[in-house]
């Protein structure tokens, strides 16, 4: 059975609500059946309604013809005085007890799913029956801190499942505010069936492409770039010092920095302030130094690519030649589609004369052949270069001796180049 309902008809206000028990007893016969006096309960009976909408439709159809100012047309066959809720000590002849029983319907809250209504605890007796003014209705309870009630989600979900079993209809019901037969019950705090994962305020929102490892790699790359930039600045300053020292064999003098417009303090020519006359020359020297360092890096890159065979250059004087059909001239000398490729000449006979490109040092061989064709005296250096290449141990000892002899003079220049040399060596080995 559902909760019982008590319907009170009063000229000032008509209300419907759910008390724990709504059974009332009347014992007297009416004297005037055409007039319904205030304060008298009209006993009637209804089949147990399924929901609030069915109860509203039954009551509205029954009492829509009533003139509430004169109470004419009210379907009453008895005029009964108000008596106590307590049943009489013994039954009477014309005793009647009527109850309204409905099942609770869903509560519709904007933005939230339909949640089964929980049972409302019985209300305490008010001062309606004592002749006082009606007590103003209590507004519905609101859950102002829903995040505090989500700790024990199992209990709320179990209550939600139990409520779904008792629900007899799935229609959405909307509370009609102002309707005297509409009851607003306190809302029971529950949790929705769709739970979003909790999120902490202030957590960084990472992009799917930006993983922690890639972020660390980016930071490490920025540190390497900053380190290399500081080393390049140091290299430029040391080379500028060396360049300036070439003009002053006895030592670099101090720059007075005196001119007609500005008066500056004494300083070195390698650190002139913007107000000094030597400032523009200092930056011109450093610009040339930066260009030379960039050229050195490009030369190293070309040497590395040429050593790997990634610069296909046809030699001037091929050592081996092959004659193939011109339609096969684009194929490599070893009948492969990978380097080294072959260079072909197309005669009129329809055949091509091809010779292969070296798999390594193709650009070096081309430049050496070009230099020998213009400068014949370079042929005298060929035995020396072959000897240095064949006797590598002697060449290393010679290099060590040169560094030992000129080391103190180059000590202020070589240290900034050491990180660059190490970087070039690693690239040479692992690429």
Curated annotation (Swiss-Prot):
Residues 2-214, 308-379, 430-431 are virion surface. Its main location: virion. Pfam families: vMSA. Keywords: Acetylation, Caveolin-mediated endocytosis of virus by host, Fusion of virus membrane with host endosomal membrane, Fusion of virus membrane with host membrane, Glycoprotein, Host-virus interaction, Lipoprotein, Membrane, Myristate, Transmembrane, Transmembrane helix, Viral attachment to host cell, Viral envelope protein, Viral penetration into host cytoplasm, Virion, Virus endocytosis by host, Virus entry into host cell. GO terms for cellular component: membrane; viral envelope; virion membrane. Isoform M is N-terminally acetylated by host at a ratio of 90%, and N-glycosylated by host at the pre-S2 region. Myristoylated. GO terms for biological process: caveolin-mediated endocytosis of virus by host cell; fusion of virus membrane with host endosome membrane; virion attachment to host cell. Glycans are attached at residue 351. Residues 2-207 are annotated as: Pre-S. It is found in: Virion membrane. Residues 149-207 are annotated as: Pre-S2. The chain crosses the membrane at residues 215-235, 287-307, 380-400, 407-429. Residues 2-286, 236-286, 401-406 are intravirion. Residues 2-148 are annotated as: Pre-S1. Residues 115-147 are annotated as: Disordered. The keyword Lipoprotein applies. A lipid is attached at residue 2 (N-myristoyl glycine). The large envelope protein is synthesized with the pre-S region at the cytosolic side of the endoplasmic reticulum and, hence will be within the virion after budding. Therefore the pre-S region is not N-glycosylated. Later a post-translational translocation of N-terminal pre-S and TM1 domains occur in about 50% of proteins at the virion surface. These molecules change their topology by an unknown mechanism, resulting in exposure of pre-S region at virion surface. Belongs to the orthohepadnavirus major surface antigen family. The large envelope protein exists in two topological conformations, one which is termed 'external' or Le-HBsAg and the other 'internal' or Li-HBsAg. In its external conformation the protein attaches the virus to cell receptors and thereby initiating infection. This interaction determines the species specificity and liver tropism. This attachment induces virion internalization predominantly through caveolin-mediated endocytosis. The large envelope protein also assures fusion between virion membrane and endosomal membrane. This is Large envelope protein.
